[in-house]
From Swiss-Prot:
Pfam families: SfsA, SfsA_N. This is Sugar fermentation stimulation protein homolog. PANTHER family: SUGAR FERMENTATION STIMULATION PROTEIN A. It comes from Parasynechococcus marenigrum (strain WH8102). It comes from the Bacteria. GO terms for molecular function: DNA binding. The gene is sfsA. Belongs to the SfsA family. The lineage of its organism: Bacteria, Bacillati, Cyanobacteriota, Cyanophyceae, Synechococcales. InterPro entries: SfsA (IPR005224), SfsA_C (IPR040452), SfsA_N (IPR041465).
């Protein structure tokens, strides 16, 4: 753990992404994009949701180019530019395969040490819940020096929908998300349960459940908090060559 305390610290760095303009998204997993060279390509869209508020044909997008014999498509759509809460352009991370890796890097950098305490190990996709039929995103084992020796079950949710400066999850009905809340409550009190909304845009100042999209999720969210589930909304800034830590944001008063 290196001790990540300064907002703006780079957590992930990568080769600069290629920029283009979105033509259309279709069949959920596909997006046609015109690159800056004028070439039109089809990219993989690693986001199964409706992408409410961040899907705008004609918007600027950023893509990762990773050709491989094992991949049907050489391009992956990573980021989208949208009008931010203040009207200025804002880049949003739309690849839902990334947040688990990003939150793991956040923990390993020590950015959540004050909230989680010292962590000895991190395991991903560990079976848990009823009949071990679900998998927790991250299972953390505290060090011997951690004041709370309970294992930490941590669920990550990519969050891109907003209402003004409030980040909202979910943006559609999610029975899977409802189930995750129930299962997080199920590990209490012998373990800690932590929900981490990954706020994948820098223009938000707080987090709240997306009640208008999924009222049942909102009800379960409130039950989970009362039961002892911890919520740590983590905000990030997405750039062409990396992702930067911007700190924890508060939960909106419910």
């Amino acid at each position: 753990m290196t001790g990540c305390t300064t907002p703006g610290d780079a957590l992930l760095s990568f080769e600069p992404l290629e920029e283009g303009v979105l033509i259309k998204r279709y069949k959920r997993f596909l997006a046609d994009v015109e690159l800056s060279s004028g070439e039109v390509i089809t990219a993989h869209c690693a986001n199964t949701g409706p992408m409410t508020g961040v899907l705008i044909p004609g918007q600027r997008v950023r893509l990762r180019h990773a050709p491989s014999p094992k991949r049907k498509l050489a391009w992956t759509w990573e980021q989208a530019e949208v009008p931010g809460a203040d009207g200025a352009p804002c880049w949003v991370g739309i690849n839902t395969a990334l947040p688990n890796r990003l939150i793991r890097a956040t923990i390993e950098a020590g950015c959540l040490a004050a909230q989680l305490g010292p962590i000895a190990s991190i395991r991903a996709e560990v079976a848990y819940g009823a009949n071990k039929r679900s998998r927790i995103d991250l299972l953390l084992t505290p060090t011997d020096s951690n004041p709370d020796q309970r294992p930490i079950y941590l669920e990550v949710k990519n969050t891109t929908w907003t209402d003004g400066t409030t980040a909202l999850f979910p943006d559609t009905v999610t029975e899977r998300g409802q189930k995750h809340l129930v299962e997080l409550m199920g590990v209490l009190p012998d373990s800690r349960a932590v929900l981490v909304p990954c706020l994948s845009r820098p223009d938000v100042t707080e987090f709240a459940p997306g009640d208008s999209a999924d009222p049942r999720y909102g009800e379960l969210f409130r039950e989970a908090i009362k039961a002892g589930v911890e919520v740590l909304p983590c905000r990030f800034r997405f750039q062409a060559d990396g992702i930067r830590w911007e700190g924890i944001r508060p939960l909106k008063q419910l």
